[in-house]
């Protein structure tokens, strides 16, 4: 991997010393939601090192929640640019507020459904199975939306189609994925965290 690592110390980087410290950025958030739905810092670091192995790449987090992956990745691997897309407006607001607190410039957050995003605008992708709440209703984060297995199938098919349109060499990091959304021409090139974190490259 290249040397796309911190060349200077971010004065607010103490937030990334532990998951507990980071979660204090969101004092009103439910701690159980943090543990179940947000990317652990150690996972974010490993995924960022894989996705941002080259400088100036654009990385999209699909279903970014409060922005934990994007913020952590932007801190650990600052020579890439990170975008999070999230359909819950309240979480996007929290992500933007957290970004301001930690003082990172190489990250932004969008409010919307990933279906509206042009994957051509991004080089590599991170996915912590944000569709699964449509597959297992016990995993619902809240009652803001309707959930169904039909939506799960629709989203996984759409993501597979979008990923399939990307060129050879495209990288994807998945965490706790069912792999239904992975095109056949993406191959696993590495795993971490007892195989829950997988690294893929399109051949």
What is the predicted function of each stretch?
Residues 1-54:
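S-adenosyl-L-methionine
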Residues 56-65:
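Conserved class I S-adenosyl-L-methionine
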Residues 81-86:
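Conserved SAM-binding motif I beta-strand of class I
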Residues 95:
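Conserved SAM-binding loop
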Residues 103-112:
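Conserved SAM-binding strand-loop segment of SAM-dependent methyltransferases
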Residues 134-203:
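C-terminal substrate-binding/active-site "lid" region of AdoMet-derived donor-dependent transferases
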């Amino acid at each position: 991997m290249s040397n796309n690592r911190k060349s200077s110390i971010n004065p607010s980087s103490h937030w990334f010393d532990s998951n507990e410290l980071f979660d204090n950025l969101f004092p009103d958030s439910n701690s159980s939601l943090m543990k179940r739905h947000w990317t652990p810092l150690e996972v974010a670091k490993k995924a960022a090192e894989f996705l941002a192995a080259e400088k100036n790449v654009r990385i999209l987090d699909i279903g970014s929640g409060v922005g934990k992956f994007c913020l952590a990745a932007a801190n650990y691997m600052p020579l890439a640019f990170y975008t999070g897309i999230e359909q819950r407006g309240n979480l996007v607001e929290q992500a933007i507020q957290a970004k301001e607190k930690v003082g990172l410039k190489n990250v932004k957050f969008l409010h919307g459904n990933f279906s509206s995003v042009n994957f051509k605008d991004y080089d590599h992708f991170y996915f912590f199975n944000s569709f699964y709440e449509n597959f297992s209703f016990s995993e619902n984060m809240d009652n803001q939306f309707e959930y169904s297995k039909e939506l799960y199938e629709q989203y996984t098919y759409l993501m597979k189609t979008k990923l399939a349109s990307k060129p050879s060499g495209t990288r994807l990091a998945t965490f706790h994925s069912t792999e239904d959304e992975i095109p056949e021409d993406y191959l696993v090139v590495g795993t971490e965290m007892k195989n829950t974190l997988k690294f893929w490259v399109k051949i």
